[in-house]
Amino acid sequence: MSTSWRGRKEPTAGELLLVNWVLVLLRGIPVAIVVFGGLILHTVLRIFEYPFLGSRRPLTQYVTQVVCKTSLFLLGISISVEGFPMKERGAVVANHSSWLDIFALNATQKIYFVAKSEVANWPGIGWLARATGTVFIQRKALQAHKQKNIFTERLLAGHKLLFFTVKTALCLGA
């Protein structure tokens, strides 16, 4: 019995059949159009939203939710929510196993992610994270007071901050 959640050997790119690549294109291209089209709409709305509302985002949060729900639908992934999402400001803690977690969590709640500062510079993902209001932190003790102030400011603005637990993206037994 394996200590990992994986039941068999992972396929390599060479083992993927032509039909798999066709599915990647048939699902991936529409998702890319939705995500980057949503980013354009999000940016245009934010241009008008920011001067009047500052860090509050009553319009662009809905764009993020619709983009994530639509993307999951296009990928053939359904979402099931148990319980009731927190309605007020506060902190949410979740495990993180893949990039799909971000879509699923954004699709079901109006949240802002807290991420390590390096994410802001990642190609593509950094752009999306910055646009959607991710809070970037430096994991250094010297920055703790500054980061506490940022968290306080965002919570007072009514934000719900989402923290991923550290190192949960690693598989067991690796």
What are these regions (language model features)?
Residues M1-R8:
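Short, charged cytosolic
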Residues R8-S80, W127-A131:
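A transmembrane-helix-recognition feature enriched in membrane-embedded lipid enzymes
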Residues F73-A174:
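Soluble catalytic domains of membrane acyltransferases
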